[in-house]
Amino acid sequence: MTTHPPADQQQGHAETAGGVLPAPTGWPAPPGPAAYHGLLGEIVRRLEPETEADPVAILAQLLVAFGAAVGRGAYFQVEATRHHPHEFLLLVGESSRARKGTAWDHVRRLISDADPTISQRILTGLSSGEGVVWAVRDGAGSDPGISDRRLLAVEPEFASVLKSTNREISTLSPTLRSAWDGRPLQLLTRTSPARSSDAHIALIGHITQPDLRHHLTALELANGLANRFLLICCRRTRLLPEGGASDPLHGTGLTAVLAGAIRHARTAGRVHLHEQARELWHHAYHQLATRPGAGIAGALCARAEAHTIRLALLYALADGERQIKPEHLAAALALWDYAERSATWALDGATGDPLAEQIHAQLLNHPGGLTRSQISDALQHNQPAHAIQCALDALTLAGRATRTRRPTAGRPAELWSATPEPVA
């Protein structure tokens, strides 16, 4: 017997084949509806039923790309610090299956249609601070420099960037920290000195949870690079075997509205809090500044106030406003709350110790457990005993490894095993 879907389900692939996927057990609760505010929220709602990508991945990347296109013509001032509309974002999800790249493809096409000039300023390949400065350098002597010093760096394999920042002589980490702060960048080499006085740099990175836990070191947590990123977990949210509509925004006029918002925001200048938003911000600021943060996830969320006000600025500019209103703060707080939940989920039990993460990976590959001697063998005898002990202690403290004793003909042998991971 042949059955047919109802007539109202025969109108497009999203309705006929699209099955919404439930969130895995333990997955962070999604952002509140307030996060999908205004123009950007409307764009995401139009795209959502036509893609397997997580709507929050589209929203977060769209916010960052929008701010990159706007440039330094708008800012919110806190004492002597100017917060321009540029952010660093790290999407965390399974390789290929989380549809991080799919979400970015939608955003890239949209932002390029709204502002064709930004296309040439979307770059990949972060490997050194020198390369970053050179891409946004001022003119000097016979070198005309780069006239458009906006830069949107997109790194689909962000683990390689974290590896680069951990090299002993790497200048990438301090350069990125200064870029997020909006400070002048300088390259002090004898052969090719360069300076960027007013760069506007935004960054989008994609990484898996295991790679994040493995490569995020205590050093990057201590020096502040990690907490300059907004961390957002994303997943595949539906199944569309034949994909959704090729251009879900066609005929909506939303791309033109976005283009107008970008042009308007470029001359916004100093953006203030609307009078009705001040009380909300004062209350939220106190909550964010005094909220206890434990472990690596807490360290990653240490710049909550700065991220929240930058997000509020982005929402306001996307609305064509030159004041931050209560709805913009509410949207920013909803997205920041999700970022905190994402950090807790992604980094629960992380050690910040690369050796500990390396040993943990070996333990996962050997469900029967490993002795100390076997652990040393797996590490090719490149680590001293005291370093291995410190790493095992860190894994034990994080609840990710357990020690048992196995009887032998002589002294009992220690057997180390990975603690079963909670289902995520």
Which ranges hold each PLM region?
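Phosphate-handling catalytic cores of nucleic-acid transaction enzymes
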Residues: 2-424
